[in-house]
Every structure is written in C-alpha cells, then in structure tokens.
C-alpha cells in the first residue's frame, strides 16, 4: 500500500514538473518568440528568487549552539560530582538535593 502511495506522488510530481517547464520550440514563429514564457513561470521582477542569509546571523546561531553544548556539559559535570561524591554542588543558587 505504501508503494502505491509513493508511485502516485512520484507521478504527480513528474507531471507537475512537465507542465511548469518551458516548452522547447522546434518551429518557432515570430508571435511565439515575441510573447516569450509565461510570467508565472519566470521571475518578472528581476529580483533574487532565493532568500538571502546574512553571514553574521548564521555565525551567531552556530556560536549559540556551541555555547549551549558547553553549558550542558558543565551542568552534567556538576551533577555527576554531586551524584558520586554527595557534595553540595550548587547550580545557580540551588542545590541538587
């Protein structure tokens, strides 16, 4: 049953791609060349089609991910010290007890 769903989706995507593609014109007359492709297919505004990503923002996100891993490992070390040694290791003013 899953195979039939997969085949239906593949066929639908293929047909959609064929419909949206710009047709190849073997015998082009002047009217067809003057009209060109449909505006719905081609970007008529002249802008970029993809969303730009600022480099600084991406670097900050990567840095935040690195920092969260460091913070998590620090908390894990404190918990393990408390768990095995039984000492009163404090995390932000709270004990593990």
Swiss-Prot record:
Gene: CRE10
UniProt name for this protein: RxLR effector protein CRE10
UniProt source species: Phytophthora infestans (strain T30-4)
Primary location recorded for the protein, binned into one broad class: secreted
An annotated GO cellular component: extracellular region
Segments carrying motif RxLR-dEER: 48-66
Signal peptide region: 1-21
Expression induction: Expression is induced during host plant infection.
Record has Signal as a keyword: yes
Family: Belongs to the RxLR effector family.
Written domain comment of the UniProt record: The RxLR-dEER motif acts to carry the protein into the host cell cytoplasm through binding to cell surface phosphatidylinositol-3-phosphate.
InterPro entries listed in its UniProt record: RXLR (IPR031825)
